[in-house]
Amino acid sequence: MKFFATIAALVVAAVAAPVAEADAEASSPMLIERAGPGGINYVQNYNGNLGQFTYNENAGTYSMYWTNGVSGDFVVGLGWSTGAARSITYSSSYTASGGSYLSVYGWINSPQAEYYIVESYGSYNPCGAGQSGVTQLGTVVSDGATYTVCTDERVNEPSITGTSTFKQYWSVRQTKRTSGTVTTGNHFAYWAKYGFGNSYNFQVMAVEAFSGTGSASVTVS
């Protein structure tokens, strides 16, 4: 197992995320009929009930909180049904202990891949030294900071097309922040040297948690 264990699963738009000892069925995402700010038209709601997830798509805002009793992994957020090399501006109040990420999150259709641009996290760094199965790919400088880049391969794991083998691409900001603009194209261009494609599935500004305690209120534009 890599990144502790596997969690996953949607038919149209999946979540396959690293978690600690957890597997579960995902809640369905939702396309929004009336787009919010920045053309936001997508709600990511994977096990959002575990984090008391609430959102206002027209305002581009959402919030959640979780405790040590969190019984699995949840990934929630707002964004776009089709990803792009766009600049995503966000602001948040995000605090977390244990396993949690504040990140741009999405999927590529072909070659199939899952990706994270991690802006802040709890105590678990997915590109940290000594992580089993991780390939370090150096660093990329973007938006005034250096990000550590790594990749991992998932073998026969749940994905946006069912069970498959795919790569995870990670950029982890070395100096955490909870607001700013993420120029996703800088990361995509760097990852492309290592096989990252441009056939985009969904893309969201997300909060994920799978252990510890925390809370977040996020605005996306």
UniProtKB/Swiss-Prot annotation:
Keyword Acyltransferase annotated: no
Record field: catalytic activity: Endohydrolysis of (1->4)-beta-D-xylosidic linkages in xylans
Signal peptide annotation: 1-22
pH-linked activity: Optimum pH is 2.0.
Superkingdom of source: Eukaryota
Enzyme class: hydrolase
Record domain GH11: where: 29-221
Active site positions: 114, 208
GO terms, molecular function: endo-1,4-beta-xylanase activity
Entry GO CC: extracellular region
Record flagged with keyword Manganese: no
GO biological process: xylan catabolic process
Record EC number: 3.2.1.8
Pathway(s): Glycan degradation; xylan degradation
Keywords from the UniProt entry: Carbohydrate metabolism, Glycosidase, Hydrolase, Polysaccharide degradation, Secreted, Signal, Xylan degradation
InterPro entries, per database record: ConA-like_dom_sf (IPR013320), GH11/12 (IPR013319), GH11_AS_1 (IPR018208), GH11_dom (IPR033123), Glyco_hydro_11 (IPR001137)
A Pfam family reported for this protein in Swiss-Prot or TrEMBL: Glyco_hydro_11
Catalytic temperature dependence: Optimum temperature is 50 degrees Celsius.
Compartments in which it is found: Secreted
Family named by the database record: Belongs to the glycosyl hydrolase 11 (cellulase G) family.
The protein's role, per its UniProt record: Endo-1,4-beta-xylanase involved in the hydrolysis of xylan, a major structural heterogeneous polysaccharide found in plant biomass representing the second most abundant polysaccharide in the biosphere, after cellulose. Hydrolyzes xylans from oat spelt and birchwood at similar rates, but it has no detectable activity toward Avicel or carboxymethyl cellulose.
Name by which UniProt lists this protein: Endo-1,4-beta-xylanase 1
